[in-house]
């Protein structure tokens, strides 16, 4: 469990470094949030948990984990009907995101990078905080090790404006 908490905090630290960079020049290149999550976590997590993000056609797509076993439409349906509602992001509150979540009620796991829409940062932060609080409440009297993971979860707004959640 401590290894998992440490890995989650390390992922948040890596994300912060990626977003802040080393220079003062403003970078307008779009960021690949799925790749950032992939690179920040252990290979075992990449094998087990898919990372989902919006596709260009308005649907959702995913990489890694079990995503290859789904037809594209089924994958979109699972993301829109099962995973995205867990984050409870208000419609129009973000312009881009990548997330990897456990939908199983026996595990606290969630990593998300969300680019808020103009003026919607607090709405995104509130949604990420609510996800963490839900995980804590679900696990508090159920699975102690998973509660500890949820209790160690973090939400941060990085200097480039993205909201990062690690649970």
Tell me the role of every PLM-derived stretch:
Residues 1-9:
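Bacterial N-terminal signal peptides that target proteins for export
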Residues 12-16:
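Alpha-helical transmembrane segments
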Residues 17-21:
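C-terminal motif of bacterial Sec signal peptides marking the signal peptidase cleavage site
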Residues 23-110, 116-167:
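Soluble, non-membrane globular domain cores that form compact, hydrophobic packing
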